[in-house]
Amino acid sequence: MGRIIFVSFGLLVVFLSLSGTGAALNCASGWSGYDQHCYKVFDKPKSWADAEKFCKKQTSGGHLVSFHSSEETDFVVKLVSQTLESQILWMGLSKVWNQCDWGWSNGAKLKYKAWAEESYCVYFSSTKKGWRSRACRLLGHFVCKSPA
């Protein structure tokens, strides 16, 4: 009887210690869990817009990865390092400045556009700290994130 209680207590301790790591999250096969979200690294480079569309199609509520803590960043960087070598990876942050509500001074709607600047999107590196921006049209690997 005492042995059964000891084993049951041991299993409870293991379960509770794993519950914060994503082991108890309901993530699809191939996805990894952390803090109520599921993550997956994709190794086929895409533009920022194509990567975001791809993430939305993968799972309900899916988007390019967003970071809300250094711990989450560390988790994703470790996940990436298990899948890819040093890479540039898109994240879900962008500055699409030319999509503001522009209009001509005579009141006409802006239909023709000839912007000289590009939109810039944010990426992170699996080996370097910090975020950087580059043209959204360039290709990069990416990580999708969705609610668990």
Swiss-Prot record:
Protein name in the entry: Snaclec B4
Role description: Interferes with one step of hemostasis (modulation of platelet aggregation, or coagulation cascade, for example).
Binding partners and assembly: Heterodimer; disulfide-linked.
Keyword Signal on entry: yes
Misc. comment: Shows greater sequence similarity to the beta than alpha subunits compared to other heterodimer snaclecs.
All residue ranges annotated as the C-type lectin domain in the record: 34-145
Subcellular location as annotated: Secreted
Organism: Macrovipera lebetinus
Disulfide bonds: C27-C38, C55-C144, C121-C136
Any one Pfam family match given in the protein's UniProt record, by short name: Lectin_C
Stated family: Belongs to the snaclec family.
Keyword annotations from UniProtKB, A to Z: Disulfide bond, Hemostasis impairing toxin, Secreted, Signal, Toxin
Coiled coil: none
Main subcellular localisation: secreted
